[in-house]
Amino acid sequence: MPRSSRQQAGREAEAFALQFLQRQGLHLIEQNWLCKRGELDLVMLDGDTVVFVEVRYRRHSGWGGATESVDFRKQAKLVTAAQLFLQQATDWASHPCRFDVIAIEGQPGNAAPLNWIKSAFDS
């Protein structure tokens, strides 16, 4: 799949995940927050908890599923990016935090199975 098609599929998966989370009552703080250490796909608020959401999309699981792609190295990058986010967005620094993963396999929005893993890993 060409890079632009993969990027489009990734954007669609993020939009699908965002809509799902908003229907669950979460509120968007930031989307695609970039820093020198990486990117945070979605930063949401669930009650009083700041939730850093990694959205992983795989069209099929031939090379490993979406969930398995959030390995230890990726987790460490997300934790570092979240720390930098909280240093800059000081209003949220005193809130409890958690790391969730949204794993989507198939075509986003076309009855693709969405797996929401709350507290997928610890910092």
From Swiss-Prot:
- Gene3D superfamilies hit by this protein: 3.40.1350.10
Output one GO MF annotation.
Answer: nucleic acid binding
InterPro entries reported for this sequence: Restrct_endonuc-II-like, tRNA_endonuc-like_dom_sf, UPF0102_YraN-like
Entry similarity comment: Belongs to the UPF0102 family.
- Protein's UniProt name: UPF0102 protein PSPPH_4120
What organism is listed for this UniProt entry?
A: Pseudomonas savastanoi pv. phaseolicola (strain 1448A / Race 6)
